[in-house]
Curated annotation (Swiss-Prot):
Record field: catalytic activity: Co-precorrin-8X = cob(II)yrinate
Subunit structure: Homodimer.
Active-site residues annotated for this sequence: H47 (proton donor/acceptor)
One example GO MF annotation: precorrin-8X methylmutase activity
UniProt protein name: Cobalt-precorrin-8 methylmutase
Gene that this polypeptide is encoded by: cbiC
Protein residues bound to substrate: S15, R44
Pfam families: CbiC
Pathway annotation from the record: Cofactor biosynthesis; adenosylcobalamin biosynthesis; cob(II)yrinate a,c-diamide from sirohydrochlorin (anaerobic route): step 9/10
Protein keywords: Cobalamin biosynthesis, Isomerase
């Protein structure tokens, strides 16, 4: 939420003030449950979506922000489910395999979605890396399977797929896995949410404000 000109800075400051007030209205006394960095991420998401309800939908599990900051400082790769998310992330090591030729081949051969196939192809990068999913519940389910069945250990999973088919269920399943994660309750999520979260963590890793 940066700005260059004086007018831009004034707008940014006013916007941040409005966002914070909206968050306070939504959370009430629950606002004390979140630490400073978590509040910074919540502010980013609310700003990106113009939807204060996200303040009560975001779930942080197993110190995900701190783990994400460490992973970014160690220059770990980020694996995403769609190229739109890749385009929005301010980081060099971002990978998306959804359009990889091998993904098309495996998906067709095995009768699975390309999203699932892309996560299987990225398995070695996911292990000790960061996963950011904002669109595909099946991709998130596959990452969870890799964690449970193949002992893959991501540093952080940002799981915020959007939609009314399997999205809520995939995020519930993520919260049951013992890995650092950030997710949303219910069907809401999507690219803007995913990008806002991971860019906030990247900003923290660079010692900037979220």
């Amino acid at each position: 939420m940066g700005a260059i000109s004086k007018d831009g800075l004034n707008i940014a400051n006013k916007s941040r003030e409005i966002v914070r007030n909206k968050i306070k209205e939504v959370l009430g006394d629950r606002i004390n449950e979140f630490n400073e960095k978590e509040m910074g991420i919540i502010e980013r998401v609310v700003h990106a979506t113009a939807d204060p309800e996200y303040a009560k939908l975001l779930v942080f599990k197993n110190n995900p922000i701190e783990e994400g900051i460490k992973a970014i400082k160690e220059e770990k790769p980020i694996i995403v489910d769609v190229n739109m998310i890749k385009a929005g992330i301010r980081y060099n090591k971002v990978h998306c395999f959804i359009n990889h030729p091998d993904v098309y081949e495996v998906a067709k051969k095995e009768g699975i979605t390309r999203a699932v196939a892309s996560m299987r192809l990225a398995k070695d990068l996911i292990d000790d890396g960061i996963v950011v999913i904002g669109n595909s519940p099946t991709a998130l389910f596959e990452v969870i399977r890799l964690v449970k069945e193949e002992n893959i250990k991501p540093k952080l999973i940002v799981g915020v797929p959007v939609g009314f088919v399997q999205a809520s269920e995939s995020k519930e399943a993520l919260r049951e896995v013992n890995v650092p994660s950030i997710s949303t309750i219910g069907p809401k999520g999507g690219t803007p949410v995913a990008v806002a979260i991971i860019n906030g963590i990247i900003a923290y890793a660079k010692n900037e404000k979220a």
